[in-house]
Amino acid sequence: MKTDIILAGVGGQGILSIAAALGSAALNNNLYMKQAETHGMSQRGGDVQSFMRISDKPIFSDLIAKGTADIILSVEPMEALRYLPYLKKGGYVVTNATPFINIPNYPEVETLMATLKALPHQVIIDADSIAKEAAGNVRASNFVMMGAGSPFIEIPFEYLEKGIMAIFERK
């Protein structure tokens, strides 16, 4: 078993919380895990991404080469497109349908969504609405997205749930 995941979004959307929960879930399931993250201008709504590699065999690099990612899990639709060159043929894009329009030249939303919907393996959900309805707060949309991506990540649900709980134990 080996799953290469690219987590993508913008600052404040909880990408690093997803990474922490997935990492905890993998380790508690006796899997190997390597992770690299970039969050330079994240506090100003900039790009945040994490490369996460999970395997039942030792992993020697935390980087994911272009064309090799099994899944792009994105909390923001434009960020899903940004990392498309990393997706392998047959890989899945799992993204939130709600854009975070924080730049003046943000692409036209209809064009963006049409491009995503044209992909052969995609799951597009309105995570913000689901989070607001289920948890009472759109800030939970990151974990809604993690749940949407869970069928493509070979970690049992109970470990994912424990991974989320581990993040919030100290809060």
Language model features with spans:
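Active-site cofactor/cluster-binding pocket
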Residues: 1-171
